[in-house]
A protein has these predicted regions:
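C-terminal alpha-helix plus adjacent terminal tail
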Residues: 1-23, 29, 69-70, 76-81, ...
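Hydrophobic/aromatic residues within transmembrane alpha-helices
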Residues: 25, 62, 126-128, 185, ...
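Short, structured loop/turn "capping" segments at alpha-beta junctions
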Residues: 167-171, 180-187
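Charged catalytic carboxylate motif
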Residues: 39-43, 97, 104, 203, ...
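Glycine- (often His-adjacent) and acidic-residue-rich active-site loop
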Residues: 56, 64-100
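Conserved CoA-thioester-binding segment of acyl-CoA-metabolizing enzymes
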Residues: 1-63
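Short acidic-hydrophobic, aromatic-tinged amphipathic segments that line or gate anion-handling sites
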Residues: 134-135, 191-203
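CoA-thioester-processing core
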Residues: 101-107, 115, 120-174, 203
C-alpha cells in the first residue's frame, strides 16, 4: 500500500491534491499544458501504479493545465517524430512503459472522471478510458502523433478508438488524423457531457463527491466490473500493437 505523501510530489509532469477522498491529478509541463514526450511516457505508468495502491482515494479526477489537455499537436505531416532509428535501449524502454501505462490506469480500482479542459492532440485515448468523460466546449480529440506523424498507432489507439467509435469510423479517424470537436465526440458517444470551460471542474468534483460518498466496497467492485473487458482487450492486443509500432521504427536510417 502507498500513501499520498509517498508520491504526491514525486512526479514532474503532474500535480496531485486530495480532498474528502477525491484525488485530482493535473497533467502539466513546467506549469503549462502537458507536452507529450519521454518524461510523461515514463512517469504516467509509475504514477498510476502508485495511485492504484492507495486505498484512501475514493475517486480520481484527471485533467490538464491551461488551454490544452495534451500536446503538442503534430502538424508536420511527412516529417516523422522519429526521423532516425532509435537505439534498442530506447525501444526496450518504450515497450515496457507502453505496456504498463494503460494497464496501470485501468488497475486503479476506483472510478476515474476525465475533465478534458481543451484539445487532446496527443494520446487522446487516455482520457477516453475514464469511467466518466467530461469535456470543455473547447476540447478536441485527435491522434496527431501516430499514422499521420509517421508512427503506427499501436500503443492503445488501435484498441480504444475502435471500441468507442466502431471499426470503420476508428480506422478513418486514425488514418486521416481527423479532429473531433467536443460536440462531435458527444454525438458519437465518446463524451458524456460538454460544458463551458468555467463549469468543467465544478461538475467533475460534483460527480466525484457523489461517488466518494458511496460505500468503499461498492465503489471499488463497480470499477472492477466496468473495466474488466477493457483489460482483456489490452491483454489481447496491446503487446502486438506496441511491437508493430517498434518494428516500423526500425525502418529508419540510423542515427
Amino acid at each position: 500500500m502507498t500513501e499520498l505523501a509517498d508520491y504526491a510530489d514525486k512526479y514532474q509532469c503532474m500535480r496531485m491534491e486530495r480532498r474528502d477522498g477525491i484525488l485530482q491529478v493535473t497533467l502539466h509541463t513546467n506549469g503549462g499544458a502537458l507536452q507529450w514526450g519521454l518524461l510523461p511516457h515514463r512517469e504516467l505508468p509509475l504514477a498510476f501504479h502508485d495511485i492504484s495502491n492507495d486505498h484512501d482515494t475514493r475517486a480520481v479526477i484527471l485533467t490538464g493545465t491551461g488551454a490544452e489537455f495534451s500536446g503538442p499537436r503534430v502538424t508536420n505531416v511527412g516529417h516523422p517524430l522519429f526521423p532516425t532509428r532509435p537505439s534498442m535501449e530506447v525501444v526496450d524502454r518504450l515497450l515496457t512503459e507502453g505496456k504498463q501505462g494503460l494497464m496501470n490506469f485501468l488497475n486503479i480500482e476506483v472510478p476515474i472522471i476525465s475533465a478534458v479542459n481543451g484539445p487532446a492532440w496527443r494520446h487522446s485515448e487516455l482520457p477516453l478510458l475514464a469511467d466518466i468523460v467530461l469535456a470543455a466546449d473547447t476540447a478536441q480529440f485527435q491522434d496527431s502523433a501516430h499514422f499521420t506523424g509517421g508512427l503506427v498507432p499501436g500503443d492503445g489507439m488501435h484498441i480504444v478508438y475502435p471500441l468507442l467509435l466502431g471499426a470503420n469510423r476508428a480506422r478513418y479517424f486514425l488514418l486521416t488524423g481527423q479532429t473531433l470537436s467536443a460536440q462531435d465526440a458527444h454525438a458519437l458517444g465518446l463524451v458524456a457531457e460538454v460544458l463551458p470551460a468555467d463549469r468543467l471542474m465544478a461538475r467533475a468534483w460534483e460527480l466525484a463527491a457523489d461517488i466518494a460518498r458511496k460505500p468503499k466496497s461498492l465503489v471499488r467492485a463497480t470499477r472492477m466490473v466496468l473495466t474488466e473487458h477493457l483489460k482483456r482487450h489490452m491483454q489481447d492486443y496491446l503487446g502486438l500493437g506496441l511491437y508493430a509500432e517498434m518494428l516500423a521504427l526500425m525502418d529508419r536510417p540510423g542515427a
